[in-house]
A protein has these predicted regions:
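A short acidic, often aromatic-flanked loop/helix-cap motif at beta-alpha or helix-coil junctions
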Residues: 2-10, 102-104, 188-192
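GT-A fold catalytic core of metal-dependent nucleotide-sugar glycosyltransferases
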Residues: 39-97
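Structured loops at beta-to-helix junctions and adjacent beta-edge loops in soluble globular domains
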Residues: 50, 96-99, 138, 172
């Protein structure tokens, strides 16, 4: 899955140019662990694979991070009404976005991804960042978004740019707004806000 991109990702991760884009990068998981980005950047393919195997013969698929209950009360996620109400947000593909707190404040990267390059690849100014802890859609949309995602990953790594999956999701949401239906939450970026929003809808 990530194999063809491994060497490029490690070259960027260990380069002085990338590490110097922000003081925190070197000590962050994506900077200090060779496995962090290959794993989180493979979420889209894992979701796509699940939609192909489709063991439950369903139309919609959602990625939920295994550790998401560190920030969301698990009782909300086992609430049957949530999954019933979630369905309408998955048409065609859901990203949950929060306003980038450093937008317009001179910060030159988003999760390590160079800001100007991110906007150029998005074809517009990215003011909202997509969360990677919960996303999904219908089978057809997942197939399309997955294709765009891996082309974008390839192009960005070839140009020497790397953030996390959230950087790439944010580009896709800006570039393909009719396909990637963004639902916005507050500046803290906690997905629990979206879960509660869906429950209250």
């Amino acid at each position: 899955m990530f194999g063809p991109f491994w060497d490029k990702a490690q070259t960027i991760r260990t380069s002085e140019d990338w590490l110097n884009r922000a003081g925190w990068l070197g000590d962050s998981p994506q900077g200090s662990s060779e496995w962090y980005n290959p794993i989180v950047m493979s979420k889209m393919s894992l979701l796509h694979d699940a939609s192909i195997y489709n063991s439950f013969d369903t139309d919609n698929f959602v990625w939920i991070d295994g550790g998401i209950t560190n920030t969301i009360n698990y009782n909300l996620l086992i609430e049957e009404r949530f999954f019933d109400k979630l369905e309408k947000y998955l048409d065609p593909f859901l990203f949950v976005q929060y306003p980038y707190p450093y937008y317009g404040q001179g910060v030159k990267e988003v999760h390590g991804f160079e800001w100007e390059a991110l906007n150029r690849m998005a074809g517009g100014t990215v003011e909202w960042i997509c969360r990677g802890g919960l996303f999904g859609g219908n089978k057809e949309a997942i197939k399309e978004v997955n294709s765009y995602y891996w082309h974008l990953l390839n192009d960005s790594l070839n140009e020497g740019f790397m953030g996390t999956e959230e950087s790439l999701f944010s580009i896709l949401a800006e570039k393909y707004p009719e396909l990637c239906r963004a639902t916005r939450i507050g500046i803290n970026g906690h997905i629990q806000e979206f879960v509660q929003k869906a429950l209250d809808d």
